[in-house]
């Protein structure tokens, strides 16, 4: 990764992109340090420290610590992620949106993006109000008047909208997927704090040394596994028919159609986590139910440490893996492109038989990749539950996202460097 960045730095255009991305991330970190008014941050920090291993603790990690400090960027990228899920699902369910996305070209994409922005603001309003209600219920606010409520909620909405804008700027003028980069930066900023908490737990005896060794070994194994699977792919052999143009013979070459095992990257995990956290998040924002009530049983059933949550989370990862695989890899479109260029897969006729074969292989590869992602995401949760180290569940999910985004960003850098090499050669 470091070597790739060094090579990219030597190219003026990529250097500008890297500097731009770094400046946006610097603004993000500055915004994470600006608290909204009328909030007792000490009381809020003490309250959320007690819930550090719950869904609110996970929110805090995803926001880079802004959630526990009630800063203007406290909501982070979650409203945008949730709105993206909703709009993409509606694009499949509503024919008009599907036509806009498929046939509208760049104009259609801009309209979909505009709808996603409005949905982000709407979700930010709901989450901002929920966060205000949480602080109000537990006496964390220094002022509970209407003006204070308006200032706090509007600050959260404006902060979330600005984070969305920064993500779009990185995607357009920087390197990689902007929202993923911001999420990556937020999680990475919490690493020193998580290491400090583990060290403190070892000193006080709250964590045994063998547990710490297990956590470190598990994280290293996770990094190796993610890196290895990220490069794995299924290659379908492709041959091109010979054709004569004048006196010259063209074609007749052998090639392959690569199909990555983990085609969707970390997006299924990020989106599945957002869906799985909806009920626990709503429950966390409401007053705690009394023991013995239905509400108490429901909260325990959907808690991030419960078996039901893990099963639902696993199924959501598989569903989103298939969802994104079908979006990114269209068998019919690939089959038509092969046919136009005189290519064919040995043993299969061009057209529908080729598309059916590609779809069959895609389903098998996606199933393996989806199960891999699900197991990798669930394993830290299970180990944390077995050894009673709840922080491991949050740390494991964070490692998956950080490593996945880092690998995707390096690939984006490498592809841009390759593109510029070809451009220089042609010029």
Residue ranges of predicted features:
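N-terminal cationic and glycine-rich segments that engage phosphates or anionic surfaces
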Residues: 1-427
